[in-house]
Curated annotation (Swiss-Prot):
The lineage of its organism: Bacteria, Pseudomonadati, Pseudomonadota, Gammaproteobacteria, Pseudomonadales. Residues 182-370 form the CheB-type methylesterase domain. Contains a C-terminal catalytic domain, and an N-terminal region which modulates catalytic activity. The active site is at S197, H224, D317. This is Protein-glutamate methylesterase/protein-glutamine glutaminase 2. Residues 143-153 have a biased composition (Pro residues). It comes from Pseudomonas fluorescens (strain ATCC BAA-477 / NRRL B-23932 / Pf-5).
Length: 373
């Protein structure tokens, strides 16, 4: 069955070109278009599309406001179009936090020339996020909290640094995959490495806000994201978390209580001296940054002292790096299917029998504390 798509943009040219590109795929059907956020809400309710492509700047109602309304009234996977600027990064992160699943740079020059790469990427993203639909509503909703639990983490990125909530106590009924996983083994890890893609910005926020300021292990983060976005993303996480978060620079020293985010468009490696190396992005690799590259360097530098975590994302990036980590005796965790936006990267870990444990997203931060403190 074809994926039904609603295209939302105030530019007639962009609506037409996006519709043409998507309609050229026999497995995608453009069921409608809208010129502003208000129309998008009405069309989403009437047409019940599988995926919505959404611009940000529009008259009457902007894209982020529309996404919030759609998530409340008819939760639907949204693919945001954004500009590759610092402001575009801020807006895109706001949209992801409001409930959008993924994003694509909005480049009129590229889309007007209709290059094959743009067509392929757009269609791949639509197909990928359409598969998140069956569990999308439950993922978008705040995680349930016991009556005695501390206040939950804010649903949006904080505008200023504030104390993060204490890790929530274990719930009585966890997803089956989590319930069957062993309790984490306490160990003096020298590094925690977390890799993710689609759905990662929100997932990383949920995990990192549960870590205390005195978290004893250095952390490296690999999120598939363009170069213009990673600095803004690191700054946002830093304002929300009790640990410090920054975009990694060449020569940065790994230290407890600090998370270094791999810069977009480049590769990040760690060395045995406790520093990171930032290398140019290799055009032969699909991902810049690439989880496999960072995991592989960690396996070489830290042997059995790494705790790797693979979160939501499409594809299989991280699997080969995790294999090297396992060969060296390190531990690998995967996010469970029920809490993933896209169960791709974690599934690759599980299917390759590389996962020491499979945990629900809301439990991973707590388990990191248990394993490392």
């Amino acid at each position: 069955m074809a994926v039904k798509v609603l295209v939302v943009d105030d530019s007639g040219f962009f609506r037409r070109r996006v519709s043409e590109i998507l309609s050229a795929d026999s497995n995608i059907q453009v069921v409608g278009t809208a010129t502003n956020g208000k129309e998008a809400i009405d069309q989403a309710l009437a047409l019940k599309p599988d995926v919505i492509t959404m611009d940000y700047e529009m008259p009457m109602m902007d894209g982020i406001t529309a996404v919030r309304h759609i998530m409340q009234r008819c939760p639907t996977p949204v693919l945001m179009f954004s500009s590759l600027t610092h402001e575009g990064a801020r807006v895109t992160l706001d949209a992801l936090d409001a409930g959008a699943v993924d994003f694509l740079p909005k480049n009129f020059e590229d889309i007007s020339r209709n290059p094959e790469k743009v067509k392929q990427l757009l269609c791949e993203k639509v197909h990928s996020i359409s598969r998140s639909n069956r569990r999308f509503s439950s993922y978008s909703a705040p995680a349930p909290q016991p009556a005695s639990a501390p206040a939950p983490a804010p649903s949006s990125f904080a505008s200023s640094r504030s104390p993060a909530p204490a890790p929530a106590p274990a719930r009585a009924a966890a997803p089956a995959a989590s319930a069957n996983s062993p309790a984490p083994k306490r160990k003096a890890y020298k590094l925690v490495a977390i890799g993710t893609s689609t759905g990662g910005p929100v997932a990383l926020q949920r995990v990192l806000t549960q870590l205390p300021a005195n978290f004893p292990a250095p952390i490296v983060l690999i999120q598939h994201m363009p170069a213009a976005f990673t600095k803004a993303f690191a700054e946002r996480l830093d304002k929300l978390c009790r640990i410090s978060v920054k975009e990694a620079e060449d020569g940065d020293i790994l230290r407890p209580g600090l998370a270094l985010l791999a810069p977009g468009g480049k590769q990040m490696m760690v060395d045995g001296r406790g520093a990171v190396k930032i290398l140019p992005g290799d055009e032969r690799l699909n991902y810049k940054p690439c989880v496999d590259i960072t995991f592989g360097s960690a396996a070489k530098s830290y042997s059995d002292k790494v705790l790797a975590v693979v979160l939501t994302g499409m594809g299989a990036d991280g699997r080969e790096g995790a294999r090297l980590l396992k060969q060296g005796g390190s531990a690998v965790w995967a996010q469970d299917e029920a809490s993933c936006v896209i169960y791709g990267m974690p599934m690759a870990i599980v299917k390759a029998n590389l996962a020491d444990a499979v945990y629900s997203l809301d439990d991973i931060g707590r388990h990191l504390v248990e394993a490392c403190l």
